[in-house]
């Protein structure tokens, strides 16, 4: 567990980390730390306007970031029926969410993961992580620790060693208000 503690410490001190998810490796940081998010965006060569996903161990961890008042109970039930799992939902963002996370949108992309290592990290950290695929923009997402080290290693502080859950593709993204699939999973 030495690696886990090392990665948690990096996360707590505002660094960008890499970690296995259901389908591909992700990179992320503290969603409430603008400097950490800037590092992440620079690492990925990703424009801030695109926004980032928040990945959490539980729905409760996401509540401070979501404006539930804009969703019906039926819409919320539809979201909850897919979690935990590889489904990302676009939901109305709360006032707490900075533009560093939401990008150009007034919504936020959120997921409750069923990956045990990510659940453990989010629980130890006490809140969600930002999440985007571990790759440079335009490159294929990394599937293994070795691929992360090859593509991003010299730019990352810590990689949480482990395996993806074997889905071999990024999570499906849906809109909670319309149920529209925005990215096939």
Curated annotation (Swiss-Prot):
A GO cellular-component term linked to this record: cytoplasm
Keywords: ATP-binding, Cytoplasm, Nucleotide-binding, Nucleotidyltransferase, Transferase, tRNA processing
Protein's GO biological process: regulation of translational fidelity; tRNA threonylcarbamoyladenosine modification
A molecular function (GO) term: ATP binding
Family matches, as Gene3D superfamilies: DHBP synthase (3.90.870.10)
Signal sequence region: none
Sequence segments annotated as region (Disordered): 163-185
Domain YrdC-like: 1-185
Compartment list: Cytoplasm
Domain of life assignment: Bacteria
One Pfam family here: Sua5_yciO_yrdC
Keyword Protease: no
Keyword Cytoplasm among record annotations: yes
Reaction it catalyzes: L-threonine + hydrogencarbonate + ATP = L-threonylcarbamoyladenylate + diphosphate + H2O
Enzyme class: transferase
Function (record text): Required for the formation of a threonylcarbamoyl group on adenosine at position 37 (t(6)A37) in tRNAs that read codons beginning with adenine. Catalyzes the conversion of L-threonine, HCO(3)(-)/CO(2) and ATP to give threonylcarbamoyl-AMP (TC-AMP) as the acyladenylate intermediate, with the release of diphosphate.
Family named by the database record: Belongs to the SUA5 family. TsaC subfamily.
Protein name, entry field: Threonylcarbamoyl-AMP synthase
Gene symbol of the encoding locus: tsaC
